[in-house]
């Protein structure tokens, strides 16, 4: 198997609304066109996939998950899990939230993968797929089944199968058939999952969730299926795990207390174990060391995904906010380590697939044979139900035939031997003619017999044909039908190919036409755009020409009049002073030019005029850029929107004094000058009106864009909700229709049974009448007897008792008959009830279909509405682009406007000083507002700087704590290294001493006599051993000092974690220092500017020569600042409240959808239960119909008694099983007890078996081998310990010494513990012999070992089965037979006994 690394993807979520409102900085960003990511200033990480803040769900799925789905279909296991801190977008990415409240474009990985899987299934019709789904939650280190909430946590266990794969025992796996079924189960599990609200996340996942899709694939072989032959096909079972991990949490940030705090502890411990596993697998130096999978349950579940046999993708979700810098850095480090983990993917093909297929085919054939055999037996039993003696005779004849066949086989064997012997004898011995003739006749007769034996008898052949006839006819009939269907299919395929060709041709034509239409539409749009621009320019030019010509005509008419009237002393001038904007123009131009209405004026003035000012165009472009930025980011965050009312008020304030100045200036100059001034002012006024209309146009476009986008989101939510409800309604309608079919079927069965029981009702009525008549006659006789005076009192009393008994019996009979009659009437009324229920269900289905039609109509309406909104949004975007284009073109247009503007300025500077004064006042006002804004921004910067300083202090304190821990560990490491070095020096000194002693001893050995040489050599060997040991110690100490391994592995791991934490905190401190430095620099610059501006303010105020104004201005200035700051805070709170309201609305929508889903789910479960009830009713009705007149009450009572009896047996066998399991825990005691049993048996029987016992043992061995083969052919089998034990009792039952008549009557099937003990005591008191009872061999009494009474075979794996010896088998069967019943031979034994 090839090793491949797991794929790691990183996704950066956009800033949240709260983060944008509080001006959080972005500390994580991706590098475009690369797979790299930068955190802080210079920390770069490289991953397999990187997704920025603008990435979509579709992009993430197509890049990372789609290859995993294809691998799943190929037969590989796949896993995707999301990792990251809380609130980083893991659940959103995986798709584990509320499915119904999510629009189509925001669906996560799980819904998209489900659709892809079922699409792949539909594309492979030659493979039979079975899809199963499970949903498990790890909450507080406990497993919880989200699809079956009633399952106890103690029933869920993590185990490993035979292949080493991790499985969850006890989890519910639901088989699904469609996407709707899977989505419904996913929604049920998501609704049951633990979530909570913290300070960091409104919908924080409080548990780890694992959604598993199992795909079982079986290849089809149509040709082999046609011939009815066995065929081999591959079994592929693959799984896809979608893991949504809970996020790591900081208690200081989340603010969790109480239960949430306990959850945080469990979540962090599980994620710490996962991080340790990733570190151990990702570190190449620790690959051979232990991997701590068992530290947490989530790591045990992910064992196959991390370092196992699955294809894995890890999606790390990070937050770009600067407040989460350290968490994001740690997540990226873990993700970088995970890239070093290597898995070994393997195809999940079942190794026993061929064997299983062969067994399934054999089982199918055996079932068919069994059905045909049962049919023949049922026919024979119906035909011979009254001929029981004939059946016994048939059985006896069959036994005789079997014996005769055995004798015949023996005779054939003898004849064969004699034939061979006579052939040899004929060649070896000379015979006379007569003997040769007889021998030849015997040979010929033998040959004839052989031919007759080889040729089958016609009777046997007929029997074989009878047995194989129905199957053969069925196969032939099926083959004919199959050929007919194949011919029809071939004809249909020809037709379909023709239609496909026609369809392809039509599609190509449609595509060509669509392309042509698109080309025409593009050219049409371009032509319309050019035409519109030309029309607008023409209209503007025409309006300008009309205005100028009207003005010239007006001035030419007003020249002969007096100068006084023309300069503004008349009534028209006064009217123009009062209404300078529109009244003079309308009064003078009304007869010459067309004044458009408001709507027409809006259409005409929609574009920016050519003669706009540069500064106004600059402001216009700035607003356009702000609007486009807002439109790009409005799907992600809500931006702060500051009103421009002050600017509008300022512009209005500037316009009013200018108007006044113009109105006053009319009376100071002669007519010609007045005409020039009026003309220039008119152009300026029209210019301002056009500019005002442009701003209003932009604001209205912005507002309409926001409203349309909000409507679009609402429409998408409504569409998604309606689609979800339609899917649910479709499932409910289908289930209710199935229930109606079952009700109709039950009604038909009830009608047939009611017709059968109607006859019974009439019969019961007749019997009841007869019983009543007998009762009245008995009463009359009793009354007559009482009225008579009998002399014999005893006889009278006796007769009275007899009559009373008859009366009681008659009453009971009448009551029983009435009850039977009532039961029959109830059964007859069952069909009417079913009809009523069916009609109610049909009405309900009609109502659901009506709801479905309404939803479809609503879907169409919402779809049209969505299309309209999309078109409006596109139109608005096009208008915005046009306005920006015109604004950009207006910068360099028409220098005449600049000359005109310069002329106006020069004109205002020279003759009209009042206009300049008002303009200065407006400029001062603007300047004052700018100074206020500067101070506000400076205060805001100061607040942010204080927050950054506090955060830096917290990080520094945390770093100091980590440094203290690190210093302690380093000191300990230093002390340990010093101790090791001293130990090394001591060992080296001791080695030197030993070398000296060895050299001395070697000299002594050379010079010493032979007697002392032995002692000296022993001393030398001891010194050498000591030197070797010291050498090894010194080598180990040197190695530890060389590699620096002076601490324990746990302490080294802790030191490594501390170093990483300190590094992350240093990076965070560095980032904070940079941000603080930049803020301080900006504050210094702002302080300098502010001091200069304050000096300017003081100079200007001093120039006013009014001392009181200074104090007033300062008060006003502070008051304005405080008010603006309060306004800013209120706006911030308002927007936060709006976001909370929006989130609450989303929660309400999710809860409403969940409630609707649960209501439909409850209806679905109720329908399923009703369907199961109807199926049981059909079974009961069929049973009653087959019984042909038996009482319902009696049958139900028999069933209840049988159930009670079975419950008693089940309790007894469970208790026996528990006792045996307790005994099996002590293998030594069991071995000793078994040895004693064997000793007693050998002592009792002297170790010799008679021939009869040998025959019995051989038969039992055959029976045991068949039992073992049966067990080995199946995987595991449970023994039916209630009914099978009663039906298959062997003939070796224990009969007491008094004979079979003295057997005790049993009140229950299973003996009690007291009976077992008494039997055990009797068994120990009697010797084991075969001569105590005169009964035949099949009823020989055998003795039982008490502790083995009532043994229940334990469910074992095939690897634990073994073959039982003959002696052991005999003893076990004897022990089981002594209890009065037979049990399957138990093959359980301790491993130590093997």
Curated annotation (Swiss-Prot):
Question: Mind telling me which GO cellular component terms the entry cites?
Answer: cilium; cytoplasm; extracellular region; microtubule
PTM-bearing positions, type Phosphoserine = 643, 646, 672, 675, 704, 999, 1365, 1387
Q: Work out whether the entry's keyword set contains Acetylation.
A: no
Its signal peptide is none
Report any one BP term from Gene Ontology: establishment of localization in cell
Q: Where is the Kinesin motor domain?
A: 5-341
Bias-annotated ranges (Basic and acidic residues): 571-580, 1267-1280
Listed binding positions for ATP are 84-91
Q: Which Pfam families match?
A: Kinesin
Predominant localisation class: cytoplasm
Feature: compositional bias, Polar residues: 1281-1295, 1309-1319
Q: Which UniProt keywords apply?
A: ATP-binding, Cell projection, Cilium, Cilium biogenesis/degradation, Coiled coil, Cytoplasm, Cytoskeleton, Microtubule, Motor protein, Nucleotide-binding, Phosphoprotein
Function of the molecule: Plays an essential role in motile ciliogenesis.
| Protein name as catalogued | Kinesin-like protein KIF27
Species source reads Mus musculus
